[in-house]
Regions:
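Extracellular adhesion/carbohydrate-binding repeat motifs centered on closely spaced tryptophans
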Residues: 1-213
Length: 213
């Protein structure tokens, strides 16, 4: 009970980060009362938030957010009771999870989120056209494979030897994730192999953007 319920954890043990409103502005503090900046997971609020160098909580699109020793683009809610919380889902044709834009590394990448398969480019933009794409996947040796897309959702991926339906891709994603069912509290990057292998590139709700102290 008590404040222990509000703890998140890193390699060094418990880390308590809470959002506190001061004169109409939100700030983040650790268990020692020290103001925090950067990307923070606030368990009591159930999400990720970003605080600038002055400690102010940011909303909207934020570029160059440090995460896993690299910089990414994030989007943080601006309304609807989740002000400042990392956005989950599609916004302006970009795919986000816990605020982090889901970018391909070099070409195009498949993602399984909330029951559907999406294909994004290096800027996290969801592709809408059915055509050939160079997909980042260790199981695809060909440079270009045919991807059928309808209403932004991938319907099938066809290599020279096999066609994978959306249902096939969902099963592959769930096998990679290691759970019976991937919920909307997770996103799976289908980048390892188009086979049923336990080689997960998945990211659970609390495992994205964890800041170490």
């Amino acid at each position: 009970g008590g404040t222990a319920d509000l703890a998140t954890y890193d390699d060094d043990g418990a880390v308590y980060v809470q959002r506190i409103k001061i004169e109409g502005k939100y700030f983040a503090f650790n268990e020692k009362g020290q103001m925090q900046d950067g990307l923070q997971y606030c368990k009591a609020d159930g999400g990720f938030y970003y605080f600038d160098d002055n400690g102010y909580q940011k909303t909207g699109r934020v570029t160059s957010v440090e995460n896993d020793d690299d910089d990414y683009t994030f989007y943080f809610n601006t309304k609807n009771g989740k002000n400042g919380q990392g956005y989950k889902g599609i916004k302006d044709d970009y795919l986000y999870f816990n605020g982090k834009r889901q970018d391909a590394d070099d070409d195009y990448r498949l993602f399984y989120y909330d029951g559907d398969i999406y294909l994004t480019n290096t800027k996290g933009k969801i592709q809408k056209s059915s055509k050939k794409y160079d997909i980042e996947n260790k199981g695809i040796a060909e440079d270009d494979v045919k991807v059928e897309i309808s209403s932004k959702k991938v319907q099938s991926v066809e290599t020279s030897t096999k066609k994978y339906t959306a249902d096939d891709l969902k099963e592959i994603a769930e096998a990679q994730f290691g759970d019976a069912k991937v919920t909307d509290d997770a996103i799976v990057s289908i980048a390892e192999n188009l086979d049923f292998l336990p080689a997960s590139q998945s990211a659970r709700w609390e495992d994205i953007g964890r800041k170490k102290y």
